[in-house]
């Protein structure tokens, strides 16, 4: 094919792909299957590889990702991205309306109108378009500046790479100059569930918002694309023909190719606002995405500037947040799950009950001390709560409704999977199955941990496949994974030659992971990712680590006598030694390589601990940012700790830091230090 014909076909393919993108993401009226869409995209990518000079920044092929971003540069926002003041009280919403009406009256205005919109539970971002082309995308950050994550945002199909302008009467002027669009990146419920199913149980995200925040900060844009996120726009500024009202600007955004909140409604007073909040209190659970409240804004945009803002939030808007959802049900029984370390976790079996838009039949009871604290018995009426978490929890017993016949929840004497007698080490809350080598549940858990994202990140090795491998005797530990053949894998349920080869390719790729990741992947009790990094730095080979005594190990930063004893105990086990031999023969990294260059030295000499819930970062990734800037992460507060980063609902660690006089900062200050 010559260049002219390729250019013609590329143009047709781009137009067709963007048309189907719009039908799928904006209008929910798909005309072709995912398979047919992928064929169009693959054809475009093939032609652009053959004629790279024809690639443009707004081509649909640029959504696929593939680049690695070593660090995210800082972008200063043109206007501050303020957070909204929020409330859980309808009365406080009414107070807000009264204040606004008084301020508007003082400005000589009439009765104001409001726009009520659903509050998407996602991550706020800013998009900058120059002459209609996306040139920059950034996070909210501290409100004044954020991280530039354009490469990751390009992978989101509902973010236009080039703005459309089909409705000239609505706009009245060309899309020239710089236009800023703000909105929320979020993850649909089905995409979130699919992502969590791929991860081991202990590494699953608590909710779609956490998954979104973590995904946006990934350095691999191809992985961002694979996770499937969405975007809803709610702010437009910089366009010469922008409408005078917020509702009309939402229409303009839709005409430009953005998805906007479908439920946005003009409200003329508090009665209509209260009706909207009440209506969506239940209806929101039927939506394919998470919403956690209602945003209320003045419709007349000219009033926004006149009313202004406080240091933290605008005076012309407020967010009403729905309270945590609770429901009453009956605890019908308890089952016991076995974790990778043999931990026995009680799980409540409930009378199926609707909660937060879904039918709940199970909830966690955490451990036997929690059962004792609650005083819960089988047959009790209990209150369950879901507040952002995927798994609901039992929060109380309705003692007034306790039936005459209830049964105590007894600690099992044997492992529910392998039948081994359970043990409870002195000073421990949990009971354990001591059959490490033989218990199928522990084998499955260890292998899933080994393959998890923060360990060796072995794609395509999910729970269903690992269960088959263990149950059929093909794999007993992580070392056996590297002896698997395509024939063995292809013979398993829901596997074929292609999917089997994908697993083998992922296993081969895992051999290139770091020595520190391997130490974490081994699943040594008390050794998390941070401790594994300290070990890798202090003991640069597995052989040297195995030879160290407890005293030498305890001298390693962040280790101490308990972890040191756990490490020695782990390496003394014959099955562990056999597994390490298999891993070494397979070519896994048994010693440290060259250390990665630091981003900067902003945290050099700092011993840092995070406590409480961060709003804009996933804990593990925030910790990695500290390490990349020369700092150390510690697991507990002591006199040696130099910095505590406190998020929402920070608890005992914050209290201890204050008592010891350790410096405490919030998330905004942390971001400024980066």
From Swiss-Prot:
One BP annotation, GO: DNA repair
Q: Does the keyword S-adenosyl-L-methionine apply?
A: no
Q: Which residues catalyse the reaction?
A: 119
Keyword ATP-binding carried by entry: no
Q: What class of enzyme is it?
A: ligase
Against InterPro entries, the record matches this protein to: BRCT_dom, BRCT_dom_sf, DisA/LigA_HHH, DNA_ligase, DNAligase_adenylation, DNAligase_N, Hlx-hairpin-Hlx_DNA-bd_motif, NA-bd_OB-fold
Which cofactor(s) does the record list? Mg(2+); Mn(2+)
**Example GO molecular function:** metal ion binding
Q: Which domain of life is it from?
A: Bacteria
Q: Which reaction is catalysed here? A: NAD(+) + (deoxyribonucleotide)n-3'-hydroxyl + 5'-phospho-(deoxyribonucleotide)m = (deoxyribonucleotide)n+m + AMP + beta-nicotinamide D-nucleotide
Keyword field: DNA damage, DNA repair, DNA replication, Ligase, Magnesium, Manganese, Metal-binding, NAD, Zinc
In terms of Pfam families, this protein maps to: BRCT, DNA_ligase_aden, DNA_ligase_OB, DNA_ligase_ZBD, HHH_2
Domain BRCT: start-end pairs: 598-674
Positions binding NAD(+) in this chain are 34-38, 83-84, 117, 140, 184, 297, 321
Which EC numbers does the record give? 6.5.1.2
Q: Which residues bind Zn(2+)?
A: 415, 418, 433, 439
Q: Which GO terms describe its cellular component?
A: cytosol
SUPFAM superfamilies assigned to the protein according to its UniProt record, in alphabetical order: BRCT domain, DNA ligase/mRNA capping enzyme, catalytic domain, Nucleic acid-binding proteins, RuvA domain 2-like
Function, as annotated, reads: DNA ligase that catalyzes the formation of phosphodiester linkages between 5'-phosphoryl and 3'-hydroxyl groups in double-stranded DNA using NAD as a coenzyme and as the energy source for the reaction. It is essential for DNA replication and repair of damaged DNA.
Return the similarity comment: Belongs to the NAD-dependent DNA ligase family. LigA subfamily.
Q: What is this protein called?
A: DNA ligase
